[in-house]
Each structure stands twice: as structure tokens, then as C-alpha cells.
Amino acid sequence: MSWLWGSTTNPQFEELAEKACSPLNLPYPQSEDIATALEVADMIRSKAIQPKMAMQSLKKRIASKNGRVQMYAIGLTDTCIKNGGDHFLLEVASKEFVDELSNLIKATTTSPEVKQMLIKYFQQWALAFKSKSELSFFVEVYNELRASGITFPPPPAPVPSHLLTTTTAPAWVDSDACMRCRSAFTFTNRKHHCRNCGLVFDQACSSHSMPLPKYGITEEVRVCDGCWAKAGRNKADAPAPAVPGRTPRSRADLDADLQRAIELSLAESQHSQNRHHSHFTPSEPPLAHGTVEDEDEQMRLAIEASLRDMEARPSAPAGLGEAPEPEYRPLPTFDLSPRENETILTFSNTMDQMAAYGERDLRRFPHAHVLAEQANTVGGRLRRNVEEKSTKQQMLMEMQDKLSQAVNLYGQILDGQQAYAAKRAHEEQARRYQQQQSYYTQQYQPQPQLYGQYPPNGYQAFVPPQQAYQPPQPQPEAQAQHAPSLYPTMPYTTPNFTSPPQERVYPQQSHSSPYSQWSPAPSHVQPGLARQASVVVPPVSSPVPAGVQRQASMTYGAPIPVAEQSQRQQQQYASAPPFASGAAPVDIPSAPPPVNLSTHPNSPQRHSYIPSHPQTQTQTQYESQPQEIPSQQDMQYGASAPPPDSLGSYVSEGTVGSAKSGLEQEHAASQIQPQPQPQASAQTQTQSQSQLQAQPQQNQYAAQTQLPAGMYNAASFPQPLPPTIFPDAPVEAPKGLEKEEKEEALLIEL
């Protein structure tokens, strides 16, 4: 109680300050003790030491020669400024303390670490003191230091205003009489100050004492009766109920509790035996026997009673409906009772009536002052009730917001799942569609054919897949007359086309050539021109060397016997591989010779429907009927082929006579081949005119004199072909073909 008499020294404060700023501590802030610093601040706030003495003690340690002590002293001063109270701030802002700090900042002998730390905290304190006018001296010194060139760090964030707000005990008020009972102070009736409110009372009105933690006072001090009543200390005099696990209990208390439990158990057992005497047999042996002589008889009886109670209970758990509901203590509430509500309503109605009458005289309402006192008494509880309801409303609103957010998040999750499922379905559908497209593309993609699969003559006949070979149908004679034939008539022996040929079934392939789908239908091909499509030979203006000849061209020094020619043809037919499309090729002696595709890889292949004739008929036609072609045949050949002088000279003896008719048939087949150009209609008209002009000339071949068998002349053989007989044939016909055909037709007529 030394602080009550205003003592200048406090050993406890000095001890704590020395402990917090000891030179034996580790470098700052490794050994900073926050608990000790707060105890020092509480002593200053509770006025256990005078603020001036506390300031001087801290100043002495800040001015120490030890840099470590200085740094810990500056940290302790900062803690005391924030928790010491306004009375300590006045001493900190005094000229004595501020000058000491400014001198340390300006001194050159100060340690750099101490100087930097002092500048930092000096700036923080100055910025915090700007809001208080009584601390303006500290701010003025701070501005002077900045103006003098002292470098301060950048200003920190605005310091909160409540940082320096500290609850401290109020200042004492002096008076000549007690402020409660109004009794004058005398020599015997001394005055006392309440440490809670600062007012002055006599002994009768301030006889209570209690600690004041809110002011940093941990020991009991004098308070008045009013502060005592407000704190509710009179209700706290009764002993508080013991809380299990928190209140220390002695062995005697435990023994007393055990004895009490035994007595209650015995009483309950005796009561149950009296009520249910018929359920127990007196000859029942005890469940527990005393084996120790000093065993307490009451303990044994209590244990037996407890065991019997456990056996009497059913082993099965009780149903949910039979389980006793736990009793919950009602929550504290500030709701008004019905009587209090009635009191407030009555007072409110009374005041409304007085306002309606406009009278200020309370004599007509004698109970108004009583109602006012009762309403005033209930007012505090009503305010707390309103605050409680407002708090609950705020909590419910926050819970509602959280529920709304949860619902929104759940909806977003569901939307995301649906969108993801739709996206997956769309991707799966697109993937299946691509698989189907790739499957169809692979299934209908034309398979490439190797060069070795083509027939030796370089042509391939089209036969619809999965169809057997069928003999050619006999053509009417009238139709044969109208169709101009490119072959001369045989006067000696005419092959019988109407006789049934030898039927053959050729192996079929599962696929067809990709060009076969563009071939013309068989019904549109004239019977006389039904032959494999050949290549259109462009006119060659330069002479061909005599040494360069086709493989199939043969020069005869003497007539070749028919048997040898037939044997060569049979060997050629036997060595020819089958067609790629499944139908056997028809090798005609007058047809172009086979082409080596290795030397002509780019030659386009054209296919047409060819009514194939049996091989035996073809052999009999050309083996037994050598013919002589009159001179008019050369004119017809000149109408459809280049002139003889542009193709070279004849061989001395001649070549195979059937080669000329083969070239004519190739030229006719190239005219029948469909062209994708818009000039197809004009070409068709030109072809029909040339065929009508060539028909009377063909009829004259039968009337001319034929040479005997085995005799040939120069006119019976065609001109030698150029070496490039099978170049890359163009798909389109030459543009000047129609004009040349018309001129040739006019020359023939002349």
C-alpha cells in the first residue's frame, strides 16, 4: 500500500524494469519478455508508481552506455506508452524526456542500431500524439528534427486512434462532505476516496474492497457502496458451485462423498426390497463374500445392492420411445414477463392520454409517477432484450446469406455437370461420326493395281463384278447393215457368229477398276465397233527411223504359213495373264500389240463394255481368211489417220494386214469413248457423218477381185507405226478433229 502515500520509489517496479532491460539478455529482440513489460505497464496504469518516477527510470536506462540495454529500454518504453494511460503520456511528452531522446538522435557517439531504432519509434510516437493537443510538444520536436536534416523512414500507415486509448482509474475528487450521505467530514469521520469512481465518501459509505482488473489493479482496494452494488459483489458472497475437474478437492472430501454414496445406495436398496419383496427369496446367497476380516460391512452391502440392481435391469436396450429425454437448462433470456409488459403498456397509454388532454397537472393521474418508476426499472432489461434480438437477427441473416451462397454454389456445380455431360455427349457423337466416315472411306476407297496385273496388250475389259461369262447375242442383220464396220468383209469364209461358242466361266475379282464406273453402258455401243478401247494416235510429222519398230510389227520376206501364225497366236494367248477385272482378254491378231507398262506408266486406261467373242472364232477368222485390201481401203484409212508420207514408208514386203484394220478400229473406239467436254454433241454428229460416208465404200470391198490364198501385195499391209505408238494418251480429243474429219469426208466424196 505504499502507493497510497505517494512514495517516490517502488522496489517492485525497479526489479521488473531491471529484469526487462538486463545487460545479460541476448541481442534484441531475442530475449524480449512481453509478460514482464506488461506487468510494468500495469503498475504505471494502476498508479502503483508515480508516472514521473516511471519516466525517469526509463530515461535513465535509455541513456545507458550499453547499446543492448538501450534497445531493450526503448522497447519497454513503447509498451508502456501503449498501455500506461494518459497520465504517463503527459510525462513522456514532457521537455525532460523529449530532450533526452532528441540529444541521443543528434549525438554522433550513439550506436547506429540504437539510433536507427530510436528514430523509428520516435516517428511512430509523434504521429500517434498528433490527435492529442496536450502532447503537442513531442510533435514539435519531431518536426524540428526533420527540418534539421535527420533522415526518418517513410511514414507508416495511419496509426489507429484507439492505440493510445487506455482505461485508467479516474482522478480523485475532493469534497467537504460525503457524496452519498452528505455527512460532514470531521476528525473522527474521515474521508475516503473510491478507487473505482474517484469520489469521496466516509467510512460508512465506503467500507467494501475489491480488485479492479480493468484498471490494472490486481489487489483489493476501497470502493464505495454504489460501485460495490453495481459490480454485484453482494450476490457473489455465496459459495459458487463446484465445477468437476476444476476445483481441487482433498482426500477428506472424497471420503465424505464415498460415504454419502454408500448411504444413498443402501437406502435405495432397502426401499426397493420393501416394494418388491415377493420378487426376492430370503435364501439367496450373497453375491460378494467378505474375505478380509476388516472389510466394512456397509461397503459389502452397498456392492451387493448395486449388483442386484444391475441384474434386475433388462439386458435389451430400451426402445427409442422409452428412453428418457435429456433435460436441457433453459438459455438465459431477457424477455419481459407479462406483468412487465402490462406495466409498460399502461404507462404508455397513460402518457398518451395526458398528451391528448393537453394537461400538465398530474393530479388527475395519481399513479403516473409509480408507473414511471416501474417502467424506468424495466427499461434496462428492455434495452438488453432489444440488443439480444438484434444480435439474433444479425446471426440469422448471416446464416441465410451462407445458405444462399451454398445453394448458388450447388446450382453452379449442377450446371457445370450438365454442361460437361452435354459436351462429352457432343464429343462422343462427333467421334462416332468421324469413325463412320473413315470406315466408309476405307471401304469404298479404290485399291491400287500393280502393273503386273494388267494384260499384255495394256487394255482391260470391263465386266460387271460377280457375273459369269456370257456368249454374245446374235445381232440382227438389219442392224449390222446400218452400223459401219471398220473391218473389210471376208469374201472366202465368213465366221459364224451365231453359232454357240464355247462357254467359259472366268474367275471374278471382288473389286472393279475405279475407271469402270465412268465407262459407257453396253447397250449404247454399236455391235460392229465393240472392241477394246485403244489410244488415239496423234499425227506424227517427222519420219520414223526404219530400225525403230513395235514389238508386234513383223516384216515378211515370204508369206507365213497359216499354221505358224496360228501357233504364235496360241502361244501368245497361253502366256497372257488373266484380266484384273475377272474377264479373259480377247486377243485379236489385228489388235495393237501388248504394251510394256514399265515404259509407259502414265498411260491412262480406258474401259468399255466389250461383247467378247470366243477365242476359237477369232482364230478361225484370221487364220483361214487372209484377204486383199483394195486401194479404196487406203482412202478410208486416210480419212481417219495421218497420211502415209507423215508416218514413214512401207516395208519392202509389208506388215501384217490386220494391223491397218486395228488402227481403224482404235480410231473408231476413241470416237465412241465418252468425252467430258462440251463438244461431245458436235463430235457425235461428225462421227455419224463419217460412218455413213464410209459405208458405201465398205460394200465395194466384197465386189472387188480377191487375191488367192497366201498371196499379198503392198496394199494389203498398213503403214509402219511410229515408235511411240502408246504415248500418254490425252483424255480429250484434239480440238481440230471435227474440222479435219469434215475436210477428209469432202475429199472422199470427190
Swiss-Prot record:
InterPro entries (UniProt xref): ENTH_VHS (IPR008942), HGS/VPS27 (IPR017073), UIM_dom (IPR003903), VHS_dom (IPR002014), Znf_FYVE (IPR000306), Znf_FYVE-rel (IPR017455), Znf_FYVE_PHD (IPR011011), Znf_RING/FYVE/PHD (IPR013083)
Membrane topology of this protein: Peripheral membrane protein
Subcellular location: Endosome membrane
Record's keyword terms, sorted: Endosome, Membrane, Metal-binding, Repeat, Zinc, Zinc-finger
GO-annotated molecular function: phosphatidylinositol binding; ubiquitin binding; zinc ion binding
Pfam families from the UniProt entry: FYVE (PF01363), UIM (PF02809), VHS (PF00790)
Name recorded for this polypeptide: Vacuolar protein sorting-associated protein 27
Organism: Cryptococcus neoformans var. neoformans serotype D (strain JEC21 / ATCC MYA-565) (Filobasidiella neoformans)
